[in-house]
Swiss-Prot record:
InterPro entries xrefs: aa-tRNA-synth_II, aa-tRNA-synth_II/BPL/LPL, Phe-tRNA-synth_IIc_asu, Phe-tRNA_ligase_II_N, Phe_tRNA_ligase_alpha1_bac, Phenylalanyl-tRNA_Synthase, tRNA-bd_arm
Pfam families: Phe_tRNA-synt_N (PF02912), tRNA-synt_2d (PF01409)
Gene this chain is encoded by: pheS
CC cofactor note: Binds 2 magnesium ions per tetramer.
Disulfide pairings: none
EC number: 6.1.1.20
Cellular localisation: Cytoplasm
Source superkingdom: Bacteria
Cofactor(s) listed in the protein's UniProt record: Mg(2+)
Keyword terms: Aminoacyl-tRNA synthetase, ATP-binding, Cytoplasm, Ligase, Magnesium, Metal-binding, Nucleotide-binding, Protein biosynthesis
Complex and partners: Tetramer of two alpha and two beta subunits.
Protein name per Swiss-Prot or TrEMBL: Phenylalanine--tRNA ligase alpha subunit
Binding of Mg(2+), residues: E253
Biological processes, Gene Ontology terms: phenylalanyl-tRNA aminoacylation
Length: 341
């Protein structure tokens, strides 16, 4: 190789200074320090020199190569600093801009319905009472005149922990507990979660109910009809037709199912009401004397009515929701439709 280590270093220094990026810098490094680089080739010539020349020339090559590496590292650090400065400059934050407000959430539609129901009943003098979700056999069945042979006690309808401990199948046990601890007049609703061994397109193992009752002297079926009519017209915000159909519940006598004129088609008939023009919304009746006897209230002196409704069903009717599973899938596209604004 004809060039000296010093001239090679001078040439390499100019190329290092001219490199505009780390990639170009790496090309210069390979040109001088690679397997076929110029400093590498100079070291290969040492074998052709005499011992005195070899020592002197080897020192010069090593010094030039070390200096090149020092210049290379310094130039690399400078290029990296410049690149970082450019990136930071492009990402500059304008601290004078207004901050982003937090996205407002909304309540679940079932929660909205529960609040609406409790607000309407409170407005006519009902108190709201909650009770335990794990109940005993007495409060969930026996005190409500549901005998041991009743189908509701079967394993396929009820979640049992033991022979006498279970997940409540309705919120009516709250009615029993309230009547055990107090004397009439009593006017109470009991909202909450209930559980049944049932899971299909229209049923879930856990759902929400609101059960209510009114116990006092001379409470009649007319009071029941008037209370539920006022509630339903207030809930749906329209003067809808209401009808009572005879039915059977162990804890009420007489008992009735409550239907309203379909709020979807206004009674003309549609898929939701199965083209009948009517929708079943709740069950009700006059409290059975045996229920009063179980809690120590004189059925000769006092009378009362009770009712129960499914919160999910009323929610679906109020908001026009046709799939029960939407309540439990946590799909934000669905839930954000119920934001207050």
């Amino acid at each position: 190789m004809n060039s000296s280590p010093e001239s090679t270093l001078e040439q390499a220094s100019r190329l290092l200074a001219a490199a505009g990026s780390v990639a170009e810098l790496d090309q210069v490094r390979v040109r001088y320090l690679g397997k076929k680089g110029e400093f590498t080739e100079q070291m290969k010539t040492l074998g052709t020199l005499s011992p005195e020349e070899r020592k002197e020339f080897g020192q010069r090559v090593n010094q030039a190569r070390d200096e090149f590496q020092r210049l290379l590292e310094r130039r690399k650090a400078a290029l990296e600093a410049e690149a970082l400065a450019r990136r930071l400059s492009s990402e500059t934050i304008d601290v004078t801009l207004p901050g982003r407000g937090q996205r407002l959430g909304g309540l679940h539609p079932v929660t909205l319905t529960l609040r609406r129901i409790t607000r309407l009943f409170r407005s006519v003098g009902f108190s709201v009472v909650e009770g335990p979700e794990i109940e005993d056999d007495f409060h969930n069945f026996e005190a409500l005149n549901i005998p041991a042979h009743h189908p509701a006690r079967a394993m396929h309808d009820t979640f049992y922990f033991s022979e006498h401990l279970l997940l409540r199948t309705h919120t009516s046990p709250v009615q029993i507990r309230v009547m055990e601890s107090g004397q009439p007049p009593l006017r109470v609703i009991a909202p909450g979660r209930v559980y049944r061994c049932d899971s299909d397109l229209t049923h879930t193992p856990m759902f929400h109910q609101v059960e209510g009752f009114w116990v006092d002297e001379q409470v009649s079926f007319a009071d029941l009809k008037g209370t539920l009519y006022e509630f339903l017209t207030g809930f749906f915000e329209k003067d809808c037709a209401v009808r009572f159909r005879p039915s059977y519940f162990p804890f009420t006598e007489p008992s009735a199912e409550v239907d309203i004129e379909c709020v979807i088609c206004d009674g003309r008939g549609c898929r939701v009401c199965k083209h009948s023009g009517w929708l079943e919304v709740m069950g009700c009746g006059m409290i059975h004397p045996r229920v009063f006897e179980a809690v120590g209230i004189d059925p000769e002196r006092y009378s009362g009515f009770a009712f129960g409704l499914g919160v999910e069903r009323l929610t679906m009717l109020r908001y026009g929701i046709n799939d029960l599973r939407l309540f439990f899938e946590n799909d934000l596209r669905f839930l954000r439709q119920f934001k207050p604004f």
